[in-house]
C-alpha cells in the first residue's frame, strides 16, 4: 500500500524527536515523533529527516536529494534556526541568507506539491547551555533568546509572504512555560518531553487551520475494521 507521507525536516531537535529518554539515566518522556506516528497510524507515514548540528545552508543541499528519492510526501515541517542564529562560528548563518535558504526550501517543496510548515526556534537557557560549552563561549559563539526572536520574527514574515503556516515556538514556550520555561529544555537548548508536547500541540493547531484534510481526525483510516473483514479476508481491499 502506498501511504502519503509527512516529512519532519530539520536539525537536532528533529533528529531527537523520537528519543523517549533525552536525559541520560532519566525517566521516559513524551516524544513528538512517536506521538505523531501513533496519531497518524493507518493514515499517513511520518518520515523523519533531522540532522544534528546542521544549518539552513547545509540543509538546503540535502532537501533536493530527499525529495528526489522519497515519493508521496504531502506535508512537511521546516525546522531550522537554532544553529543559524548562533552569534559566530561555523554554524552561524546571517539572517538574510537564512531567510533566503528557507524561502528556497519552501519553493522547492511547493514545486513537489508539498504543503510546508515553517517552525521558528524555541528558547535557550544560556546559563545551562553555556556550562557545557566553555570552548565555544571562549570563541564568542553565543545563542541568545534575543537573536532567536529576531530569526523567528523574520520566519513569521516569510511564512506570511509565502502563505504557509508558521509556528512561533519561542512565544508558545514563554506562554505555556511561564516562569518555569527552562523545564521545557534538557541541556538549555534541546527540548524535554514537556517542550516536545508544546511543539506537538502547536503543530497540530496549524495543521487543523491550514491543512485540515491532513489533521489526524479528518483522515480516513486505511483498510476495514477487523470486525468487518470476512473470515477468508476476501473483502479487505475492496
UniProtKB/Swiss-Prot annotation:
InterPro entries per UniProt: GDSL, Iah1-like, SGNH_hydro_sf
Question: Might you name a Gene Ontology BP term for this protein?
Answer: lipid catabolic process
What residues form the catalytic site here? Answer: 12, 187, 190
Q: What happens when the gene is disrupted?
A: Accumulates approximately 19 times higher amounts of isoamyl acetate compared to wild-type in laboratory scale sake brewing.
Write out the catalysed reaction.
Answer: 3-methylbutyl acetate + H2O = 3-methylbutanol + acetate + H(+)
Describe activity versus pH: Optimum pH is 7.5.
Q: Name one Pfam family in it.
A: Lipase_GDSL
Which residues are listed under the site Transition state stabilizer? Answer: 53, 83
The UniProt keyword set, sorted, is:
Hydrolase, Lipid degradation, Lipid metabolism
Gene Ontology molecular functions? hydrolase activity, acting on ester bonds
Q: What is its EC number?
A: 3.1.1.112
> What does the UniProt function comment say about this protein?
Plays a crucial role in the hydrolysis of isoamyl acetate in sake mash. Hydrolyzes short chain esters from acetate (C2) to hexanoate (C6), showing more specificity for shorter chain exters. No activity for decanoate (C10) esters.
Q: Which family does it belong to?
A: Belongs to the 'GDSL' lipolytic enzyme family. IAH1 subfamily.
Assembly with partners or alone: Homodimer.
Protein name per the record: Isoamyl acetate-hydrolyzing esterase
Q: Which organism is it from?
A: Saccharomyces cerevisiae (strain ATCC 204508 / S288c) (Baker's yeast)
Q: What is the lineage of its organism?
A: Eukaryota, Fungi, Dikarya, Ascomycota, Saccharomycotina
Q: Which gene encodes it?
A: IAH1
